[in-house]
UniProtKB/Swiss-Prot annotation:
A lipid is attached at C19 (S-diacylglycerol cysteine). The lineage of its organism: Bacteria, Pseudomonadati, Pseudomonadota, Gammaproteobacteria, Aeromonadales. It comes from Aeromonas salmonicida (strain A449). This is Outer-membrane lipoprotein LolB. It is found in: Cell outer membrane. Plays a critical role in the incorporation of lipoproteins in the outer membrane after they are released by the LolA protein.
Length: 194
């Protein structure tokens, strides 16, 4: 009788498995083609929130980033709208306006931010990483050929929450760990220039 029950149970399982519906999987993205498309995306804007955790402090900010070719403008404000900093790069010149409205200039944006806030923010790699590009770093892909993670020197970036935006598949969540810091960037809105 037990052999009959086993065969009957196995048959029922096969029958049920045949009746289940499978979710259609998203078409595999050709990584090289998608990478080339993302590399050509040079004018965009995003807004979101960033959590910053270091050994000494925890903070959060609203983020607005505008990228125009090699130039950018990064605005950080508190969650209640108070100005924290504005960092801009224009024609190779880096300027940071602090929370008191004072301008500071440097050739090293990351060092300037750290000097004024104590936060390590990997500004140099962010324009590529934000779009889901690894630059020249080591990387891993998700099964759908989107970027899963990047390891670039002292920084590890883990991606999540990809969404379709104007024909691109863009990340809406990045967790960056490195240099004694952990940053979590939640992107609420992408605006792509045409």
């Amino acid at each position: 009788m037990t052999l009959f029950l086993r065969i009957f149970t196995f048959g029922c399982l096969l029958l049920l498995a045949g009746c289940t519906t499978t979710q259609p999987q998203r078409d595999q993205v050709n990584w090289q083609k998608e990478r080339t498309r993302l590399e050509q995306l040079s004018h965009w804007q995003l807004s979101g929130k960033m959590a910053i955790i270091t050994v000494q402090q925890k903070g959060s900010a609203r983020v607005n980033w505008q990228q125009n070719g090699d130039d950018y403008r990064l605005n950080l404000t508190s969650l209640i709208g108070t100005h924290i900093l504005e960092l801009s790069r224009s024609n190779g010149e880096i300027t940071l306006i602090d929370n008191e409205g004072n301008p500071h200039q440097s050739q090293d944006a990351e060092a300037l931010i750290y000097q004024l806030t104590g936060w390590n923010i990997p500004v140099q790699g962010l324009p590529e990483w934000i779009k889901g590009l690894p630059g020249k770093a080591e990387f891993e892909l998700n099964p759908d050929s989107s970027l899963a993670s990047v390891r670039d020197g002292q920084w590890q970036i883990v991606y999540g929450d990809y969404r379709d935006q104007d024909g691109y598949r863009l990340p809406h969540l990045l967790t960056m760990t490195g240099q004694g810091s952990r940053l979590k960037l939640q992107i609420n809105q992408w605006t792509l220039a045409r």
